[in-house]
């Protein structure tokens, strides 16, 4: 009798289980359990199933908590390691960033811009530090060559003697840098020796930089206002020059300049003119592997210029609003022309004219990847289309060469920022 009752109990329990789920979970399995005779067998089975589910959930939560504890411990260990490394880096940065350093290209970085500066100096590896010192030496040598050119033009024996003294100092510094590079390659020298050697070299560089700056200041006081060039030695988002004057409304223009660059890929942006509501009102740019382009009201024409060979080149672009006709000249010869470039759109007035950077906003929003790297001089703008003969006179430094009637190249009208420099330059005397 008891066996029959147990069989009926299992059968009823199976029916309850089958009736409580609508999904098919595969082959049916029967579970027998002891329950009182007068108990509700279906309710008992459901309660048992709920208890099993709760037990399973508790086990899963326990496993999750254990895994999270392990993760937290691992992350704490990682944080300790990173904190230690950061402390070492900060200590090394403090040693490397002494007050007597002479660094080319400035060291300033615009906060919050989110742009790549690409010109900040490395603060950790000794080899990269020596590379930066080498760049500084090269920059000082170039400035010295300009002083030498100036002394030849003015036949000053005092300037010549100073030039010889500075050249001797530069030669000594080059020997010190070369010796330090050889020591690094042989694996000699510890961190203390590195710091001491670098301090000596940078102290000499600082002294040399100050002396050349003094000579250049005296040179600037004596040179004509248009006999200068701008130099942008590094691709950064903070090195640029600004023209104090703005442009009037123009229905035609000619823009000409001397350029020298060996930057690759792309020489960057020699100049950009932005107005409220249009950052690309007038832009000359070559970036990436694209050819040089002229933008007017954000409309583009590709130009046939090839100028990144490290030599001086004279370039001009003319444009008229009627049919958007344009012409491009390199070294006095027309190399390309076209039409339908922003036709019937006059150049808007009251904008900001920047040399060396492309503007994403009015007067700012610079991007290092589009910055100009090289040298620029005799930037002039006219409010008309120059003739081929007039362009040729400019490229050959003829006595008949004209100055821009809208923007004329004058040192007093150019402000420099972020480490850009002004050096003496005379077109056709220093060409290549």
Swiss-Prot record:
Any GO BP: cellular response to glucose stimulus
Cofactor(s) it depends on: Ca(2+)
Cofactor descriptive note: Binds 2 calcium ions per subunit.
Domain Pentraxin (PTX): 226-428
Keyword annotations from UniProtKB, A to Z: Calcium, Cytoplasmic vesicle, Disulfide bond, Endoplasmic reticulum, Glycoprotein, Metal-binding, Secreted, Signal
Tissues expressing this chain: Expressed in brain and kidney.
Keyword Glycoprotein recorded: yes
Keyword Endoplasmic reticulum: yes
Residues that, per the record, bind Ca(2+) 1: 280, 358-360
Secretion signal span: 1-22
One Pfam assignment: Pentaxin
Residue positions binding Ca(2+) 2: 358, 360, 370
Subcellular location: Secreted; Cytoplasmic vesicle, Secretory vesicle; Endoplasmic reticulum
Molecular functions (GO terms): metal ion binding
Start and end residues of each stretch annotated as Disordered: 88-122
Sites carrying sugar chains: 154, 193
GO cellular component: endoplasmic reticulum; glutamatergic synapse; synaptic cleft; transport vesicle
Disulfide bonds: 256-316
Entry function: May be involved in mediating uptake of synaptic material during synapse remodeling or in mediating the synaptic clustering of AMPA glutamate receptors at a subset of excitatory synapses.
Subunit structure comment from the entry: Homooligomer or heterooligomer (probably pentamer) with neuronal pentraxin receptor (NPTXR).
Name this protein carries in UniProt: Neuronal pentraxin-1
Organism whose genome encodes this protein: Mus musculus
Gene giving rise to this polypeptide: Nptx1
């Amino acid at each position: 009798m008891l066996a029959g009752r147990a069989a009926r109990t299992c059968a009823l329990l199976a029916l309850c289980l089958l009736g409580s789920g609508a999904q098919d979970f595969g082959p049916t399995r029967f579970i027998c359990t002891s329950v009182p005779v007068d108990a509700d067998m279906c309710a008992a089975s459901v309660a048992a199933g709920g208890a099993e589910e709760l037990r399973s959930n508790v086990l899963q939560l326990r496993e999750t908590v254990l895994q999270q504890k392990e993760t937290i411990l691992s992350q704490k260990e990682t944080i300790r390691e990173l904190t230690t490394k950061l402390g070492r880096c900060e200590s090394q940065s403090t040693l490397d960033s002494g007050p007597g350093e002479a660094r080319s290209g400035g060291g300033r970085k615009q906060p919050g811009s989110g742009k790549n500066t690409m010109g900040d100096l490395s603060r950790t590896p000794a080899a990269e530090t020596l590379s930066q010192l080498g760049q500084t030496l090269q920059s000082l040598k170039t400035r010295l060559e300009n002083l030498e050119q100036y002394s030849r033009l003015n036949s000053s024996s005092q300037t010549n003697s100073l030039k010889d003294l500075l050249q001797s100092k530069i030669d000594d510094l080059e020997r010190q840098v070369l010796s330090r590079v050889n020591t690094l390659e042989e694996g000699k020298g510890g961190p203390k020796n590195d710091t001491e050697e670098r301090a000596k070299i940078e102290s000499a560089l600082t002294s040399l930089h100050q002396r050349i700056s003094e000579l250049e200041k005296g040179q600037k006081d004596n040179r004509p206002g248009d006999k200068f060039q701008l130099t942008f030695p590094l691709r950064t988002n903070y090195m640029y020059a600004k023209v104090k004057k703005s442009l009037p409304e123009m229905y035609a223009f000619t823009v000409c300049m001397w350029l020298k660059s060996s930057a690759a890929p792309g020489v960057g942006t020699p100049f950009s003119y932005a107005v409220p509501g249009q950052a690309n009102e007038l832009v000359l740019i070559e970036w990436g592997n694209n050819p040089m382009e002229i933008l007017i009201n954000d409309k583009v024409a590709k130009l046939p210029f090839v100028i990144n060979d490290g030599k001086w080149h004279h370039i001009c672009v003319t444009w008229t609003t009627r049919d958007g006709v344009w012409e491009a000249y390199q070294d006095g010869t027309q190399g390309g022309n076209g039409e339908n470039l922003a036709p019937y759109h006059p150049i808007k007035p009251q904008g900001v004219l920047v040399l060396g950077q492309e503007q994403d906003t009015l007067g700012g929003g610079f991007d290092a990847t589009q910055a100009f790297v090289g040298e620029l001089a005799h930037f002039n703008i006219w409010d008309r289309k120059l003739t081929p003969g007039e362009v040729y006179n400019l490229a050959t430094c003829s006595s008949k060469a004209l100055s821009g009637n809208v923007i004329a190249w004058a040192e007093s009208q150019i402000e420099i920022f972020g480490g850009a420099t002004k050096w003496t330059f005379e077109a056709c005397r220093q060409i290549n």
